[in-house]
Amino acid sequence: MAVRLRLAHTADLEPAELRRARALLDAAFDGDFSAEDWDHGLGGIHVLLQDGAGLAAHGSVVMRRIRHRGRWLRTGYVEAVAVRADARRTGLGGRVMAELERVIDRAYDLGALAASDEGALLYAARGWQRWGGQVHALSPDGVVRLPEAEGGVWLRPGLAGPLDPARELVFDWREGDVT
């Protein structure tokens, strides 16, 4: 069965498409995909892969700002990547990531994401690099360190060039998980 790819901004998705994407994510994360997690994946570009059984895979890239060495980098942040259970290990996750990476490479200074141990295998195989330095956020109370995020942030160097792990990353603030 042929798999159809659709690339669209959140604003161009029909309500039914958004509901199907949310249902896929809820199922893929065993109900551990919160309203804040969903919100983090909106407002950017979505990759949707459809097969004969419906929505098989999804991922999105949204704009964030990350400061490094005093410069705020326009960052394509990967969110909400999932593959339907019966379609896993068929290359669909790689197809989603290839499209997201194409968007990142053409439109952003840097790509970034936070990965689970299981997801990290996919990202490492695709050339993403685990960030070895400190992670901070610009919170309402000022810059705060996020030691729990360290080791879980992955980067795709782009137009910004290589980053120095001796210097911290400072993420813009958002509700819920900052990274």
Give the predicted meaning of each segment.
Residues 1-15, 168-178:
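Conserved N-terminal entry element of GNAT/NAT acetyltransferase domains
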Residues 7-82:
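A conserved beta-strand-loop-helix scaffold within acyl/acetyltransferase catalytic domains
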Residues 21, 123-124, 128:
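Conserved active-site tyrosine of GNAT-family acetyltransferases
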Residues 78-88, 118:
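A short, internal acetyl-CoA/4′-phosphopantetheine-binding micro-motif in the GNAT/acyltransferase core
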Residues 86-99:
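Conserved acetyl-CoA pyrophosphate-binding loop and the N-cap/start of the following alpha-helix
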Residues 102-116:
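Conserved GNAT acetyl-CoA-binding A-motif
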Residues 112-122, 137:
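Conserved beta-strand-loop-alpha-helix junction that forms the acyl-donor binding cleft
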Residues 129-155:
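Conserved catalytic-core motifs of GNAT/GCN5-like acyltransferases
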